[in-house]
Amino acid sequence: VVLGIDATLEANRDDWFVRETIGMLRRTLARLDVSSRSLYALVEPGSCFAGTLFEIALAADRSYMLDDPWRPSAIALSTMNFGTLPMVNGRSRIASRFYEEAEPIAAAKACIGEMLAPADALALGLVTAAPDDLDWSDELRIALEERAALSPDALTGLEANLRFGIFETMNTRIFGRLSAWENLIYSRPNAVGETGALKRYGSGKKAQFDWKRV
């Protein structure tokens, strides 16, 4: 259904209403790119990560896809994933994911319209990991505990670096990296407060963080 909607949007891009709809989708997804929060996507049976909606998984910092033959899950790509909904750096999320390397982008493009199983999605580099049903809950728990062990402000900056890679624009400087590092890292109590990471560094005491990341 989602792929059919994407095809309709692509076929009618010259219509003013469709053009505005695509623009709204682009702006909405771009807000995820500059979010100060960690974003995880979970691809499970019944998920609808296809075409435009797969952009949400591509915008996430990590994506996990359940590999369970008894409860199959799948993702799918459409032409909307290849430039119609660019990030704030002007590039598609797939291009940014692969640092614009031609070979993996071409491999992904060759699979447009196909329902990709976990093994295929992982081989193409479209998801972070594809644990089986035995490891699924433990992998997610460990992933969340890893994030929770780090300063939320530091993560904001590190995640901004990973999301935009080597491609920088004025938008990413102001609303991505610069905003993260200047406003959320150097001057916040999590770094320089009495119980912050810099104050507690080398003391043997654990830093105490404010987990509100806005």
Language-model features, listed with the residues they occupy:
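Alpha-helical structural elements of signaling/regulatory helical domains
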Residues: 100, 132, 149-153
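Short, surface-exposed connector motifs at secondary-structure boundaries
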Residues: 34-38, 99-104, 123-126
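Short, well-structured beta-strand/strand-turn elements
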Residues: 127-138
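CoA-thioester-processing core
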Residues: 50-109
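A structural motif
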Residues: 60, 126-127
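C-terminal alpha-helix plus adjacent terminal tail
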Residues: 1-56, 63-70, 109-120, 138, ...
